[in-house]
């Protein structure tokens, strides 16, 4: 009996695309690789372990006893064909991005395009993989733009939170201003302060008021990105509460009391938007946001770390320029092809196996460094844990590319670069030995 013929059908479809963990059982290596790709397209996570899994993937020729055993354990059961049917059975197939003269569409969200010549250089985005994780993040920002609601993106470092907003601004033709907050940020930087006068002449004043980023953005219709929000002091953030209201307002009590917005003398541009990014509060030095401040961010997105298959897709995209298609909300989305960054690497016969090993090593050492969900197995005596991010991986790929000239195989080059970028940054010899063991486990060392 197939999945569509039994009582599990609706239950099976309900767990797809919501971060479910699907255990692959009884498949050979080639079939496992194919199924992992399908699982990722569906927005789920592939695992080889049954504990903690939501569903089990069995071979098409699995026995009735195997299926019955999995059902008895409370799992939703798929065969390979059934899983593929769900992935390919989306009612609609659409391009993930559509750039028109007057509008921009990211997945299902359409926003107007402006005509600003932005400071964002499209070349800075050449390393992007337009996968499910990145595009759903950009969609969250586009949703905020469409409805004029302040948007906060929270996630681990180097998960492309700020990049997604800047990329969206570039495509939308909007001027975006990025403000890096810290414990030293004061209200003068954001709202304004008096500075020595720049005027000339005998009667020039000694001081003049210089508006901060927020008043200028309100007037000119800029998008403002407040980076690392929870590094700033609470009293600095609370000064922004009126700007986070709908509609935004601001009274310059620091100067002449002029009012931006409703009932004031300075109108707020309809293009003004406010974004924030932050790492989880468990990070060192991060403040806990007040309930009043947090509540004013009407759209809040939690951005996860890329999984090992997503890391592999990113590496492939750097070489081929192709981002993976994925199923989201019942639609199969097709990202556009981009210019490959390192196309010369495609000439190596061991490219695919090397990229898989690189992605596997990064995922393993990142996990060993620990996160908010799991303790560290390396760097345990340090006050701050080691961090290996997407940025680390991009640096490694750049060095692999630059050192590949004249090499006959890529694996040796990759092993040397990974040792240099990842292992040599570890201070403790025991940690370096543990990291080297992880590298050997991927077959690279």
Regions from the PLM with identified roles:
Residues 1-11, 80-96:
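Defense-system signaling and execution modules centered on TIR/cGAS-STING-like, death/scaffold domains
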Residues 2, 89-445:
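C-terminal regulatory/interaction module of P-loop NTP-utilizing enzymes
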Residues 8-12, 57, 63, 69, ...:
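Low-complexity, compositionally biased segments
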Residues 9-85:
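Interaction modules related to DNA damage response and DNA replication/repair
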